[in-house]
């Protein structure tokens, strides 16, 4: 599978490594599947991982390295 949207360059401008990006996207996707409310009103992607990547690209979800947790930005 190839990521075309959001672009990997835009995603990596928000997260410091591909590893951090994949962990962050997976954690956020699990949260969305568990019923957490989305941080965006509209998504281009239907799947949870795609939605998580869109939230990361929009700057709505970030990594907190001190706690290794997903943080939602208002």
Curated annotation (Swiss-Prot):
One of the GO BP terms on file: DNA-templated transcription
Nucleotidyltransferase in keyword set: yes
Keywords from the UniProt entry: DNA-directed RNA polymerase, Nucleotidyltransferase, Transcription, Transferase
Major enzyme class: transferase
EC assignment: 2.7.7.6
InterPro entries: DNA-dir_RNA_pol_omega, Pol_omega/Rpo6/RPB6, RPB6/omega-like_sf
Pfam family, one: RNA_pol_Rpb6
One Gene Ontology molecular-function label: DNA-directed RNA polymerase activity
Catalytic reactions on record: RNA(n) + a ribonucleoside 5'-triphosphate = RNA(n+1) + diphosphate
A GO term from the CC aspect: DNA-directed RNA polymerase complex
NCBIfam families: rpoZ
SUBUNIT field: The RNAP catalytic core consists of 2 alpha, 1 beta, 1 beta' and 1 omega subunit. When a sigma factor is associated with the core the holoenzyme is formed, which can initiate transcription.
Protein task: Promotes RNA polymerase assembly. Latches the N- and C-terminal regions of the beta' subunit thereby facilitating its interaction with the beta and alpha subunits.
HAMAP family the UniProt entry points to: RNApol_bact_RpoZ
Protein family (similarity comment): Belongs to the RNA polymerase subunit omega family.
Protein's name according to its UniProt entry: DNA-directed RNA polymerase subunit omega
Naturally occurring in which organism (per UniProt): Lactobacillus helveticus (strain DPC 4571)
């Amino acid at each position: 599978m190839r990521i075309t949207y959001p672009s990997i360059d835009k995603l990596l401008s928000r997260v410091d490594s591909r590893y951090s990006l994949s962990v962050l996207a997976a954690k956020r996707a699990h949260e969305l599947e568990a019923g957490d409310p989305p941080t965006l009103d509209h998504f281009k992607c239907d799947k949870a991982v795609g939605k998580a990547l869109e939230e990361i690209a929009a700057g709505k979800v970030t990594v907190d390295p001190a706690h290794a947790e997903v943080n939602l930005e208002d």
